[in-house]
From Swiss-Prot:
GO terms for biological process: tRNA methylation; tRNA wobble uridine modification. Its cofactor is FAD. This is tRNA uridine 5-carboxymethylaminomethyl modification enzyme MnmG. The gene is mnmG. Belongs to the MnmG family. NAD(+) binds at residues 269-283. GO terms for cellular component: cytosol. It comes from Chlorobium chlorochromatii (strain CaD3). It is found in: Cytoplasm. NAD-binding protein involved in the addition of a carboxymethylaminomethyl (cmnm) group at the wobble position (U34) of certain tRNAs, forming tRNA-cmnm(5)s(2)U34.
Length: 621
């Protein structure tokens, strides 16, 4: 009998199986195609707004995604450099073939992981507890717990124009039939969602004179806090072009053969990643939309047309591409398509990602209604950790909204109504100044170390970094820069003169004044700091902490107040009908979502502040 069975080997499944195995559990990974482990079926990239922060959080907890992209990335960029540090988000293009191979190699090296190429068609239970999985041969494999990471495979249906095919992720991959029905028979409620992907084109047929080059950063920021040294491969460029009014006219021609507009697609698509035809329909006043041409790897001519996700007929897709500058003679390797799939409403899971109906059964990834590799990987990691912690009768790992973007993601899933694919944004996190990509290791290393995923050397390295940050901050608060040196720097930055010696931390709070400029101005200051640390990452944290000190303190106080609400637990079987005074909508939503604490209850749509007050009085708070 296995300790943990993971069903599906996408990004959620990979993190789940690795976390459980590295924590010492005996694990089985079941997937319908072992050559497609961690396949990037859509965009060949990791990171981006909020997603880059999640990837670094996965790394800080001891997950693998950050190392995988560092090893197989072909272009690295830090987005939103012109904005504040809360908005900085790392992103990297991946060699999609190498990424999949990397993750398979890592999984095969783990001695606690067995692999099985098969399809799970049902789960088996004993009472209300998970007991095993049934595969296509009807054989039952017993396990103490299971994590379902089925992606878009559940009754997957692919649409290209008015044609549709059964498919799990691509036309070449069969869907999983029967598992949704089996879970519904156990009492779960399922819904239907849609996502899509753009056509792929031959890079040799692009006219590069008509597109704008977008190179990677000269000094790339890697994702893993453990990654050191040079990139594994030479960086490649992406390219930017845009649709035209002619493009829009061509695509409108195909609306009558669009599964989106003719009602053939019943699933709800992602609001913030719409198809190109949906953008044209929803924003008729816009004359053009940006198109990003992204290479799929070093040794392939295949290019991903980001911004042109579509399920229009093939002939319309190609004609539309030919109307875009630089793509007049482009050759289409494979068309874009939409895929519909089943998911399960996430109010049916707990904060640990264990299902409410069946004990020791966990859901992670798109089965919970999310979109994106990073969101899936984060859920897989947390499900893997919590499955093992529960098996050992240890306290679960539940990250709060002020701990991590991962905490925001899971909290949103279980408290908000999800009827469209959920994706993470920086705006989703009310504590985003605390949850930066650069401090993920500082925020989360204790959690990763406690559960046994973060190795000793990384834990100690982070502890040392924190000690150096504190020592540098203490030193800077005690040092004053004499007025001559201070004015020399301020004049260069077009500030007015100051009189008397200036405290270094006061100078550092000014816009455009950086620690690097202060050190260049004062060799003595540089020497004093060098005695503590020469680590630029330490200096970066010191500068951010100093510049945003007031905001950070205020945010921390707000987070502390919210934490007090999180400490007020609600009994799992509380009878909401017995609580007089609750609004009808509030009672209905509380009964549906079954919040675990007052904080969660307060974030449920439809539960009013007066409902929360009544609930707290009833619980004697």
């Amino acid at each position: 009998m296995y300790d943990v069975i993971v069903v599906g080997a996408g990004h959620a499944g990979c993190e789940a199986i690795l976390a459980a195995a590295r924590m010492g559990a005996t694990c089985l990974l079941i997937t319908s195609d072992l050559t497609a482990i961690a396949r990037m079926s859509c965009n060949p990239a990791i990171g981006g707004m909020a997603k880059g922060q999640i990837t670094r959080e996965i790394d800080a907890l001891g997950g693998e995604m950050a190392k995988a992209i560092d090893a197989t990335g072909i272009q690295f960029r830090l987005l939103n450099r012109s904005k504040g540090p809360a908005m900085h988000s790392p992103r990297a293009q991946a060699d999609r073939t190498l990424y999949s191979l990397y993750m398979r190699t890592i999984i095969e090296r783990e001695p606690n992981i067995d692999l099985l190429q098969d399809t799970v068609i049902a789960i088996e239970t004993k009472g209300e507890c998970f007991a095993g999985v049934r595969i296509t041969s009807s054989r039952v494999i017993e396990g103490k717990s299971a994590i379902l990471t089925c992606g878009t495979f559940l009754n997957g249906l692919i649409h290209v124009g008015m044609n549709h095919f059964a498919g799990g992720r691509t036309i070449a991959e069969p869907p999983v039939v029967g598992l949704t029905e089996n879970l519904c028979a156990h009492g779960f409620q399922a819904g239907r969602l849609k996502t899509g992907t753009p056509p792929r084109i031959d890079s040799r047929s692009i006219d590069y004179r008509k597109v704008d080059e977008q190179p990677g950063d000269i000094e790339p920021i890697l994702f893993s806090f453990e990654s050191k040294g040079a990139l594994q491969s030479k960086q490649v460029s992406c390219f930017i072009t845009k649709t035209t009014e002619e493009t829009h006219a061509i695509l409108r021609k195909g609306f009558e053969r669009s599964p989106l507009f003719t009602g053939k697609v019943q699933g709800i698509g992602p609001r913030y990643c719409p198809s190109v035809e949906d953008k044209i329909f929803r924003f008729p006043d816009k004359n053009s939309h940006h198109i990003f041409l992204e290479p799929e790897g070093i040794d392939t001519n295949e290019m991903y047309v980001n911004g042109f996700s579509t399920s229009l007929p093939e002939d319309i897709q190609l004609e539309g591409l030919h109307s875009i500058p630089g793509l007049e003679q482009v050759k289409m390797i494979r068309p874009g398509y939409a895929i519909e799939y089943d998911y399960f409403y996430p109010h049916q899971i707990q904060a640990t990602l264990e299902t409410r109906l069946i004990e020791n059964l966990y859901f992670a990834g798109q089965i919970n209604g999310t979109s994106g590799y990073e969101e899936a990987a984060a859920q897989g990691l947390m499900a893997g950790i919590n499955a093992v912690l529960k098996m050992r009768k240890h306290e679960p790992l539940i990250l709060t909204r002020s701990d991590a973007y991962i905490g925001v993601l899971i909290d949103d899933l279980i408290t908000k109504e999800t009827n469209e694919p959920y994706r993470m944004f920086t705006s989703s996190a009310e504590h985003r100044l605390l949850l930066r990509h650069d401090n993920a290791d500082i925020r989360l290393h204790e959690f990763g170390y406690r559960v046994g995923l973060l190795p000793e050397h990384r834990y100690q390295a982070t502890r040392q970094k924190i000690e150096q940050i504190n020592a540098v901050k203490t030193l800077l608060s005690q040092i004053r820069l004499e007025s001559g040196l201070a004015n020399k720097l301020l004049q260069e930055l077009e500030y007015g003169e100051v009189t008397g010696a200036q405290q270094v931390t006061t100078l550092l709070k000014r816009p455009r004044v950086t620690l690097a400029k202060l050190l260049a101005t004062s060799p003595e200051l540089h020497s004093q700091l060098s005695n503590i640390s020469n680590n630029p990452l330490v200096y970066e944290q010191v500068e951010i902490d100093c510049k945003y000190e007031g905001y950070l303190k205020r945010d921390a106080l707000v987070a502390e107040k919210i934490q007090r609400l999180e400490a007020h637990h609600i009994p799992a079987l509380l009878d909401y009908h017995a609580i007089a005074g609750l609004s009808n909508e509030g009672r209905e939503k509380l009964k549906k979502h079954r919040p675990e604490n007052i904080g969660q209850a307060s974030r449920i749509l439809g539960v009013s502040p007066s409902d929360i007050s009544i609930l707290m009085v009833h619980l004697g708070r």
